[in-house]
């Protein structure tokens, strides 16, 4: 009997621990650096959400390619971008920033993820309005504690930038449902048009549908969650295991 009790306790502990370890919601954002809709979504939906109460429950992946295309000839890669050559350069800057931005060990409040988010948000806010046609990379780096702008710029102007942008393109082309609009948002690496459309107007509410309990307080404002909470899952598991435990004696 004691062995059975120990087995039940161990199983419940493993199941609950697994649920907690998978708490972060994976979100992939496929976008273009000079796309107005991408800019609106990132600056008005993504940035406020992940810089607020939801920052610890999401895992963001940015894929800066969108409807661009590329052709490879030998070692050369030629890109054609939805909003012209400036967007190709912007996409490369984004790809290089995602690759190269590092946390500052002397400023622990600036994590790699938060620095990347701040930098991308700044670039997207600038949109197509560059004073004197100067791309705002250096300004956004300076304003957001990015200490290695020169590395990012060198990457964007070199073969490395082309390689990283091609990887973003390959990732975009591997989507099960071909990308037809920008931005496109995936939750848990799965595309669902209804979820995508809802996320673009209410990202916080959509994220909360995927967050296990205990949820951040902001989720209390969004009561349409369709995903069972961790507490609900634990209760169901406890009931099922309890039934199994009782029946094992008969």
UniProtKB/Swiss-Prot annotation:
Disruption phenotype: RNAi-mediated knockdown in the fat body or hemocyte of flies infected with the Gram-negative bacterium E.coli results in an increase in bacterial load 24 hours after infection. Keywords: Glycoprotein, Immunity, Secreted, Signal, Ubl conjugation. The keyword Protease does not apply. It comes from the Eukaryota. GO terms for cellular component: extracellular region; plasma membrane. Pfam families: GILT. The keyword Metal-binding does not apply. Conjugated to URM1, a ubiquitin-like protein. Glycans are attached at residue 157. GO terms for molecular function: oxidoreductase activity; oxidoreductase activity, acting on a sulfur group of donors; oxidoreductase activity, acting on a sulfur group of donors, disulfide as acceptor. It is found in: Secreted. Gene3D superfamilies: Glutaredoxin. InterPro entries: Interferon-induced_GILT. GO terms for biological process: immune system process; positive regulation of defense response to bacterium. Induction: Up-regulated following injection with the Gram-negative bacterium E.coli. Up-regulation increases between 1 and 6 hours after the injection, then expression remains at a relatively steady level until 72 hours when it is strongly up-regulated. Residues 1-21 form the signal peptide. Belongs to the GILT family. Involved in the immune response to bacterial infection. This is GILT-like protein 1.
